[in-house]
Amino acid sequence: MIIPIKKIILESLQDKIKHKVIVYGEAHFHRDEVDRIRNDIIKLKPDIIIHELPEDYKFYKIHLPSTRFYQLERGLDQNIYKYFKGDYKKQFEIREKNMLRNIDFVLSDGLVKMPPKVVAIVVGDTHLRTIDTPELGPKSPFYNRDYIIIRSKYKEIKWLFQLRR
């Protein structure tokens, strides 16, 4: 039986390499929050940045040119908003599963190329909710991982519900 080399490498490295993964919850529409997170990430100098907003790529390429940048929602079918119009619970479930799948892919790909020691992830703070809600479903699946999570001071989920009233 022939075992692919990538599988052998991944299996041998999994026990030895531990990533320090820091997830920032961002209130996207608060400029001070965006700037604070950007400054934190620049100081952190992570090996990889995984970001929900692809437009931040240009900023990080200027300030951290050797850091690898990945889009968090790569491969997401944008039609979910049409298929599940108004069903935020289903939209969030699909999006968050896709996000975690992309994170797993990036980390496993990184193991083969160059093991990342520090990974920064930026996601809307609502995706880091600590409570179940009828509108958005169960608490965030990000808490099922061994990640350091830094929430927004604005607690975007509260802000989201205020908008709807």
What annotation goes with each model-predicted range?
Residues M1-R165:
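Compositional signal for N-terminal targeting/processing segments
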